[in-house]
Amino acid sequence: MLDGSLRSETVPLWHRGMTDVAIELHKAVHPARWCITFADLKFFQSEVRRVIQDGMTFQENFEASYGPSMYVVNEQYIKPVTAAAGKMSWALMMNPDGLDCDLFITHAWQEDVFEFTDKVLTSWPWRARHAWCCMLANPQNLDIGALLQSPSMSPFALALQSSKYMLVVPNRHKSVYTRLWCGYEAYLAFQSNKIIRTASPSIWREALCSWLRMFPALLVGLTIGVVSKVGQLDLFLQFILTMRMIALLASLVSQHCGLMRLCLVANHVGLASISVFIITDGTLWSKYVHIPFSGMTALLLVNIHRICIWVYFLLAEVDRVNCQTEMEEAEALQKQYQGSIRHASCSEVRDEVNIRHEIGDQVDEVDKVIQVLLKAGISSDALRAAYLQGVELRHAGFVQLAIPVLVLGPLLLLGCGLVGQYIVLLDEAADPIAEVYPFWLPVQCTSILARLAFLCLFCRRSIDEQCFMLNVMAKIVTAFYVFMLELSTLGNGGFCSELSIVLFIVYSLSFLVVLFFAVLGIRGTLKLPGGRQLAQFFLSRLVVSGNWRLSRTQLESSPECSEVFSQSTGDASDSSGSESSS
């Protein structure tokens, strides 16, 4: 069935049909090493797709994009394949010597196979090399019950304790935390201070659909730009700049409030308004945008300014789609969950008794771990500390990337280039601002160094702290840069007006504030006077539900997106697992 596609080191195991060989293999390899690689999971996904396309009949009806449930895949694919290979687990069939565990995957078995693989492959931590997943790690043709007699010594527990990362896979049917084994894994994560993340599916198809829906707005903007250039409509262009500012602010605020439809409208209006100035020349734009240089440098800055704002609205639309997906995953993780693992169940009475005995009187602590995960999308010691101090963590694990990507990418490179030009061509290009703006160089250098330090710190932090850092940057830069600089954009006082100078200093030094909170982290921020309120500001997101949200179904039904979605072969949702198959 696998067409001999496995790596060569697994071939000697193919003809070992004896149960005792499989038992000895699993005894020889530590349970925490019953792992697969990213490539193994992609191979598993492709093989299941292949057998479906070849006409294998599964014992249930299923949607092609989701695939059959894991229960059915286990019975009709995993068991037969591993039985033919020698009755070892699928993981040891692929990697007979085992692999060190980096990632522990929790799921609930009722999820559909392509939901599971899509979410795990999309959310796989980039530093993780190997993953432990019960359906592929445990030998499904052997006596699994014998492995679970002591929950604390089960393969689940040993693998989780060895892992660096933990991923919970929601599904569209029921919360994984209605399963007691999944609750027990949350207990183990609490005991060993693991960070738990929620897996989510790929959003590239939805993002592509959203960009296609923005194409008419782009055409409208370009058309208005042509008309304005021909007619020299300066007053009208100033109105368009005002619309751009309003759309930019609406896009930022609506994402922080979870107003997805308002965000959609703002991104369309913003893209149309900025597209007007793609056609017009730079001198017209520079009447309303203050540029500290002259000549070709000024023209280059004008064009980069326009392009950055144009790119912002495209990235903001990706953020909107991602935010909506995160909301849907949060809802899936809460489906039928009754607020405590006291109500969770086990398929085996013996397992339930053993698990509840091991958790003992720490049920409330486990419930807090799960509650933080349900609210934030991430559960960690730092976030739990914030939660216990009364910080609202709703969707704290979601970050807006549009602002950080711009200020840490093209705008940072632009700043470095301007500093280089200022130093090399001080007598020629920099004279206009050197006379009236002598502090430009030290302020700009401070801004650049702060952002570089932020990037270095970001690479060394855990995922929960990284989310906090990006949220800090998005909110502080939004407040200090976008809003105030947009006010300056509409001013008539020229670049060297007092307002422009103040705004430049505030924008540049705002990155020192960002770096300050990044160094403190979540726990350090909580210790500051008013720390709870600051953490609330940085972490929380006001979510307005109801008719303001665009659903995935609405996206799929739109004519612009129907062709893109019709080509989709993998989607959606999955859950967390330690429940053994019977």
Regions found by a protein language model. Name each.
Residues 2-565:
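The feature represents the membrane-entry module of six-transmembrane cation channels
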Residues 555-582:
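Intrinsically disordered, low-complexity serine/threonine-rich segments
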